[in-house]
Amino acid sequence: MQEIENLHQSVLLQEVLQAFTPLEEGILIDCTLGLGGHSKAILSQKPHLKLIGIDKDKFAQEIAKERLKEFEGRYNLLSGGFAKRFKEALEIHGERIKGVLVDLGVSSLQLDDDNRGFNFRSHALDMRMDLESELNAQKVINSYPVVALEKIFRDYGEIKEYKKIAHKIAERRAKKPFKDAKDLSEFLSSLSKNKKIHPATLVFQAVRIEVNSELEELKEFLQCARNLKEAILCVISFHSLEDALVKNAFKDYAKNCICDPSSFKCACSNNHALGAILTKKPITPSPEEIKNNRRSRSAKMRVFQFKP
């Protein structure tokens, strides 16, 4: 377990603790429990707070359970997609929920596991958070029609040469299907001379988002989160697509006027804000944190306070 403690560093940990400083009692929902780093720190500081932890990855959840064993009786762990499980928890617990945390990153344990397919040297082409899910990266890369590959590379990877890459992948797989992440990574490297970013980075991002329906799940969650009352919502994102969804949702939550934009005059009483944005700009890791944990460098945290 000490090895896990050393391997896994929770991103923006002190900033998360600061965001939840007002919480004393009630329930905190950690929508992306992972290895339980954030939850463990919060429970340590908040003796009267209870936790609901959610994660798709049952292996990670077992590790989190072991790390949280000193808080036995104060937490309940749920398996599955966080949008669905959060909605269920909100229906059951309602206003007892005082804090919600969503960390959209992939854990170091998942990234470094060569059997999971998240890194460029993996012996698998998988990328599933939920190992019971039918869709994996191999099916996407070796089976998706070219037009479908173009779409996910464009929409989820924001890749400029999305058509070229999709067609090159299709040409190669027709001769020899891709067998693992290392095979795909090396092939993508042969197509690009980009020195600033590994040629496979954005393709891997796009495929991972597709395999795990990441953006759709985030959209569903943000819509459901509108029903929170007197709760603090903290979301950590790791790329521009996620951050844009969170930023726009928070702006929407904070709108007083809900009239049609084309209206000449407000007719809605102009008092419909669900609360206030607590972060005018996203909170990012300090230079020291980035030095100690390079994978934190793209993290952005936004916080919203819902009113009663």
Curated annotation (Swiss-Prot):
Keywords: Cytoplasm, Methyltransferase, rRNA processing, S-adenosyl-L-methionine, Transferase. It is an enzyme of class 2 (transferase). It comes from the Bacteria. Pfam families: Methyltransf_5. The keyword NAD does not apply. Its EC number is 2.1.1.199. Its main location: cytoplasm. It catalyses: cytidine(1402) in 16S rRNA + S-adenosyl-L-methionine = N(4)-methylcytidine(1402) in 16S rRNA + S-adenosyl-L-homocysteine + H(+). It is found in: Cytoplasm. S-adenosyl-L-methionine binds at residues 36-38, 55, 82, 103, 110. InterPro entries: RsmH, SAM-dep_MeTrfase_MraW_recog, SAM-dependent_MTases_sf. One of its GO terms (biological process) is rRNA base methylation. One of its GO terms (cellular component) is cytoplasm. The keyword Transmembrane helix does not apply. One of its GO terms (molecular function) is rRNA (cytosine-N4-)-methyltransferase activity. Belongs to the methyltransferase superfamily. RsmH family. Specifically methylates the N4 position of cytidine in position 1402 (C1402) of 16S rRNA. This is Ribosomal RNA small subunit methyltransferase H. It comes from Helicobacter pylori (strain J99 / ATCC 700824) (Campylobacter pylori J99).
